[in-house]
From Swiss-Prot:
The active site is at C517, H602, E604. This is Anthranilate synthase, phenazine specific. Residues 1-434 are annotated as: Anthranilate synthase component I. Keywords: Antibiotic biosynthesis, Glutamine amidotransferase, Lyase, Transferase, Virulence. Its EC number is 4.1.3.27. Involved in the biosynthesis of the antibiotic, phenazine, a nitrogen-containing heterocyclic molecule having important roles in virulence, competition and biological control. The gene is phzE. It comes from Pseudomonas fluorescens. GO terms for molecular function: anthranilate synthase activity; transferase activity.
């Protein structure tokens, strides 16, 4: 250990230390090395206000460590309880690296006595909230999945900074499979955690996100291969992961020139449980503060669609989240004149005040077929590594077992090749699309960003506008009316009313357009089709359907569905409309008519196997079947 590192550690081990951080980031700093940081704290109002020194040429350095509370998502205009948790930034003034062996030799190991241990919500109370979310939110079409938190509370007897450092030591010694193991002391509070999940990292212009979902809780005797295989075969667990991959693909589509490239899945094994995970990579030139802003916050700890999830969280968590589901982000200079970024989601994290009051918030992903009491048990398991004395038991590992690897690989057999390809492989420019202008109208679901990436790969020139923006249909060869949450019949809502008016305008002008999911439902109503709420929502469901004579595997995210008893309808003022539908239930999968097409499913989703081809075929139909004398002069809304 260098003398400089020893001096920093001596200051950190003082009875009243200055702000500091000890970070074990094996994927970034290298295995066996910890960052030792001391700095000065500030409270910027917004992420753009984080003060960064100019990038330098030479040795890489770390500049700022920021702690981003959940309520910071209000920056994006999304709903959030304002619990007065500030955005915190540590401007790093001194930094060193030391080995894990040297760190363990220095850290204290004092006994930790927890008093008054309890959850703020009992298992029964939490299960009741899960039931309400399934019935009232997922069941009403507000979204596909939501994460609702509960919080473990306790007091550390005779608390001192050495208690938190001992807690950090225990995690460092025993936790495995984590992305960051850390202690961050701000002066007024201390965060100690073992987060399994990267939020986003950027190095040499390559951005990486790491969606993790699905949970296997180890039994008291430890994991077994049979149970691991059962976990990997569980459709609910797979669906949870596919849904968060879709949501993070939306984010990557916003910040990366060519969108995200999906790698995996893999088994992530930890001390008390295991998860499944993917990685998503993409090239970006955006400022790191802008990247953090655009990725507030991970769907794995909020839900999807994100904007709708924020409204649900605000309704069911009136006390706010503080820093739970926020992030710790480390911004630096890469030594080549550019920025580096590494960040971890603030989960599996204890928030300790200077009196020793401990808060550990955890959550469970609620989907349409969640079992409420099972979700309560899962939330307890997620907290187990921090709550208990962290039993020093060796756990078996199965991530490299041939059967496990084969089971993981099989999850990609029927998903979209497009998102598994790199950007060069995706280019599928079609001569009849090259250079054509497309307007996408976003209805509060950034699946539209993924649609845009697929359209650009086909050679189209894409513009995305929110339904609430001023826009015109003039100058575009095609219009895509996008998906979003909500009841398509509720025209009292401004968004729904807007979609009805816009789609009727497109029909009247006979402009070529494609309607997706919510907009497909609005189109169905405009055409006089019956619309019903589904008894069991399709939220993150892959089905094989007959799409106008072709068997296709497609992904559905819908609570409402149009129905028809016929495969064709002749509609006055419109013409003949072809209907792709379920022959048993009559549920409508897609429509084709003069100058338009629509789909209830999401061709852009990871769950749709041949998404770009399906979109291309439907757009081609809309263009080819546009009447020669169609009006193109009237403006859209």
């Amino acid at each position: 250990m260098s003398q400089a590192a020893a001096r920093l550690m001596e200051r950190i081990l003082q009875p009243v230390p200055e702000p500091f951080a000890l970070l074990y980031r094996p994927e970034s700093s290298g295995p066996g090395l910890l960052n030792v940081l001391i700095g000065e704290m500030s409270q910027p109002q917004v992420l753009a206000d984080i003060d960064l020194p100019a990038p330098s040429i030479g040795a890489p350095r770390l500049d700022v460590l920021t702690l981003i509370p959940y309520c910071q998502i209000a920056e994006r205009g999304f709903a959030a309880v304002d619990d007065q948790s500030p955005l915190l930034a540590m401007n790093i003034t001194e930094q060193q690296t030391i080995s894990i062996e040297q760190m363990l030799a220095l850290l204290p190991n004092v006994p930790i006595q927890l008093n008054n241990e309890r959850f703020d919500l009992s298992d029964a109370s939490y299960a009741e909230i899960v039931s309400q979310v399934i019935a009232n939110e997922i069941g009403s079409g507000e979204g596909a999945n939501f994460v609702i938190k509960r919080t473990f509370l306790a007091e550390i007897s005779e608390y001192q900074p050495a208690s938190a450092l001992s807690f950090f030591r225990h995690l460092l010694e025993r936790e495995k499979g984590v992305y960051w193991t850390f202690i961050i002391h701000t002066g007024s509070r201390t965060f100690v955690g073992a987060s399994p999940e990267r939020h986003i990292s950027v190095k040499d212009g390559l951005a990486v996100m790491n969606p993790i979902s699905g949970t296997y809780r180890y039994p008291p005797a430890g994991p077994s291969l049979t149970e691991v295989m059962d976990f990997l075969a569980d459709r609910k667990e797979a669906d949870e992961l596919y849904m968060v991959v879709d949501e993070e693909l939306k984010m990557m589509a916003r910040i990366c020139e060519d969108g995200g490239h999906v790698l995996g899945p893999y088994l992530k094994e930890m001390t008390h449980l295991a998860h499944t995970e993917y990685f998503i990579e993409g090239r970006t030139r955006r400022d790191v503060r802008e990247i953090l802003h655009e990725t507030l916050f991970a769907p794995t700890v909020t839900g999807s669609p994100l904007e709708s999830a924020c409204r649900v969280i605000e309704r069911y968590e009136p006390q706010g989240r503080a820093y739970y589901s926020g992030m710790a982000a480390l911004i630096g200079s890469d030594g080549k004149g550019g920025r580096s970024l590494d960040s971890a989601i603030l989960i599996r994290t204890a928030d300790i005040d200077n009196c020793g009051q401990v808060r550990i918030s955890v959550g469970s992903t609620i989907v349409r077929h969640s079992e409420p009491l099972t979700e309560a048990a899962e939330s307890r398991a997620k907290a187990a590594g921090l709550i208990a004395a962290l039993k020093n038991q060796a756990a078996s590992r199965f991530g490299d077992h041939l059967q496990v690897r084969a089971a993981l690989a099989s999850r990609n057999a029927y998903v979209s090749d497009f998102w598994l390809m790199n950007s060069q492989q995706r280019q599928q420019t079609q001569s009849d699309f090259s250079g054509r202008q497309v307007l996408i109208v976003d209805a509060e679901d950034t699946f539209t960003s993924m649609i845009a990436k697929q359209l650009r790969a086909l050679g189209l020139v894409v513009t995305v506008r929110s339904f609430s923006d001023e826009y015109s249909f003039d100058g575009y060869d095609l219009v895509i009316m996008g998906p979003g949450p909500g009841n398509p019949s509720d025209v009292q809502l401004p968004k729904i009313d807007h979609l009805h008016v816009a789609i009727r305008s497109l029909l009247n002008q006979q402009r070529p357009f494609l309607a997706v999911c919510l907009s497909h439902q609005v189109l169905s109503l405009c055409l006089g089709l019956e619309l019903q709420r589904k008894a069991i929502p399709n939220q993150g469901v892959q089905k094989q359907i007959d799409l106008f004579g072709n068997a296709e595997r497609v992904g559905f995210y819908n609570t409402f569905a149009a129905r028809s008893s016929s495969d064709r309808l002749d509609i006055d003022g419109i013409g003949t409309v072809e209907i792709s539908r379920d022959s048993e239930t009559g549920e409508v999968h897609a429509l084709r008519g003069p100058a338009f097409a629509s789909m209830q499913f999401h061709a852009e989703s990871l769950l749709t196997q041949e998404g770009p081809r399906i979109i291309a075929d439907l757009l081609r139909h809309a263009l080819i079947h546009t009447p020669v004398d169609s009006s193109v002069s009237a403006a859209g809304r």
